[in-house]
Amino acid sequence: MGGCCSSSRKSHLVGTPVYYYCPESFEELVPSGTRAGVGSAFTTGLLVDIGLETSIPDTFCAPAPLPYDLLLGRPQCTDSESIKGRMSGSSFETLATCEDLGESDCKTLASSVILSPRKSDFSKHQGLKILVDEEEDCCPICFEDYDVENPRLTTKCEHEFHLSCLLEWIERSDRCPICDKEVVFDDRLN
């Protein structure tokens, strides 16, 4: 089987492209009775530019991307014997079901779990709020901390910026970069 390629020489760029016939094997050089003719030679041979460089490129070729459904992490075991071994260590037989407890106990347990948040969950949320406040102690335009040389300025929409960053921003737009309201700020510095 073969193919074709057009010439990329500068002299041929002006006119019609030139095609070169390159057979894949020596047998294609001799026309047989069934393949005689120019049309059949072009369909079975390979056309290549004479000036084509066939050496291996020195550039790095990136590997093929991973399939989207590939799971990263520890491999999943599909052997039924190993699954049975893991299941035998756990005691699913001893778990209480709703039939064992009675239907009213199950409903009471479910409603009490939903209505009463645990104290540990509440403390986790407070810890996250403290971390967010600490992370937001920088200018949202340049992401640098506030200091004496570049002070903090609070706008009427209660967003904080460096004075220099906000003045530069106002040259391009009169809207707040965070909430898109009109930027109005006090003359006093915070």
Swiss-Prot record:
Q: Where are the zinc fingers (RING-type)?
A: 139-180
Entry keyword set: Metal-binding, Transferase, Ubl conjugation pathway, Zinc, Zinc-finger
Pathway the protein contributes to: Protein modification; protein ubiquitination
Q: Which CDD domains match?
A: RING-H2_AIRP1-like (cd23116)
UniProt EC number: 2.3.2.27
- A Gene Ontology BP annotation from the UniProt entry: protein ubiquitination
Signal peptide: which range, if any?
none
Q: What is this protein called?
A: Probable E3 ubiquitin-protein ligase RHB1A
| Molecular-function GO terms, alphabetical | transferase activity; zinc ion binding
What does the record give as the reaction this protein catalyses?
S-ubiquitinyl-[E2 ubiquitin-conjugating enzyme]-L-cysteine + [acceptor protein]-L-lysine = [E2 ubiquitin-conjugating enzyme]-L-cysteine + N(6)-ubiquitinyl-[acceptor protein]-L-lysine
Q: What does this protein do?
A: Probable E3 ubiquitin-protein ligase that may possess E3 ubiquitin ligase activity in vitro.
